[in-house]
């Protein structure tokens, strides 16, 4: 089964031009309509402004799509939470039932790789959830990063996670964790986590050379490029950690588990911060889109 690409994406791939994959969970689960559609189209516009071709990824009527039309993005936004989040395990069911599915980081990587897209920009990856030593709640995103040949540009793992354990799993999976002009892992809403990345990238060109080296040497798996949130949108570390702790406590009390955890926590954090965390989330995605496209341009030189 092939993935469907739109004309713009197909042409760019044929001409070895930078195509940037984008997930659709941020549209369906990340924020309400019409803000979700406006944000998705703005991210696409930023990629174009920097000389790349955006490819928003999802499953529509059972068809895997890499490069949605604006009309499809609009419909995705309107359907919102009624569209299920789809990770690797869910893809066969959604395709067989000819349903709609919102692509997580893992699914976006799978479909991007099938279409021949090397680069994928997102907000933050999933990882090891707090308390995973008893719940075993570990995102499938980490497994995908270990196996699938896509470079992911993000602002680190989502701050609601156990970041030290997430780094340990990435090390086990052989995933290089690179920091764009930082030697410290960004923590999504904040620029610093107190944890070191594997290597600090000084330039777009250096990032491109490292990706080429991994591909040319035949090492399967992803490359993770972490890019800190812009300073002006960074949140106070102590304040956001207190909010996250409060949100996790409420989630545990309500018995929320599995793939419902992340949407609940992000929405609760946005509620407690009066929307500031959502604004930070949007701005870091915009920033990642710009940086990711510049790296992709260097890669295809």
Regions found by a protein language model. Give the residues of each.
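Active-site glycine-rich loop that binds ribose-phosphate moieties when present
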Residues: 104, 133-146, 150-171, 205-209
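Anionic-ligand binding region
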Residues: 191-216
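A generic, well-ordered mixed alpha/beta core segment in the N-terminal half of proteins
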Residues: 51, 71-121, 125
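A C-terminal functional module that forms or caps the active site or interfaces directly
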Residues: 219-287
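Glycine-rich nucleotide/cofactor/substrate-binding loop typically near the N-terminus or early
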Residues: 24, 29-31, 37-92, 216-232
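General beta-strand structural signal in soluble alpha/beta enzymes
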Residues: 20-22, 55-59, 101, 119-124, ...
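Solvent-exposed alpha-helices and their adjacent loops that cap or buttress functional pockets
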Residues: 11-14, 19-20, 111-114, 119-121, ...
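N-terminal basic/disordered segments at the start of proteins
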Residues: 2-13
């Amino acid at each position: 089964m092939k993935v469907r690409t739109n004309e713009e994406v197909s042409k760019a791939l044929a001409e070895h031009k930078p195509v940037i994959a984008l997930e659709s969970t941020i549209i369906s689960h990340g924020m309400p309509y019409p803000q979700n559609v406006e944000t998705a189209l703005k991210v696409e516009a930023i990629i174009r402004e920097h000389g790349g071709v955006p490819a928003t990824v999802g499953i529509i009527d059972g068809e895997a799509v890499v490069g949605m039309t604006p009309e499809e993005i609009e419909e995705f936004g309107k359907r919102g939470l009624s569209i299920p989040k789809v990770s690797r395990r869910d893809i066969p069911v959604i395709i067989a039932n000819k349903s709609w599915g919102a692509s997580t980081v893992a699914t976006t990587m799978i479909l991007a790789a099938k279409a021949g897209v090397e680069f994928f920009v997102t907000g933050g990856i999933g990882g090891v959830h707090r308390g995973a030593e008893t719940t075993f709640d570990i995102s499938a995103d980490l497994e995908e990063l270990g196996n699938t040949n896509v470079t992911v540009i993000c602002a680190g793992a989502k701050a609601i996670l156990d970041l030290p354990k997430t780094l340990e799993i990435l090390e086990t999976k052989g995933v290089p964790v690179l920091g764009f002009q930082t030697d410290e892992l960004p923590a999504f809403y904040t620029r610093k986590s107190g944890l070191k990345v594997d290597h600090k990238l000084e330039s777009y060109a250096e990032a491109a050379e490292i990706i080429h080296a991994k591909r040319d040497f035949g090492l399967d798996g992803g490359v993770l490029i972490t890019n800190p949130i812009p300073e002006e949108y960074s949140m106070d570390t102590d304040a956001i950690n207190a909010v996250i702790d409060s949100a996790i406590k409420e989630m545990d009390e309500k018995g929320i588990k599995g793939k419902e955890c992340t949407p609940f926590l992000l929405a609760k954090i946005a509620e407690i911060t009066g929307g500031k965390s959502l604004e930070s989330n949007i701005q870091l995605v915009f920033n990642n889109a710009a940086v990711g496209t510049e790296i992709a341009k260097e890669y295809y030189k």
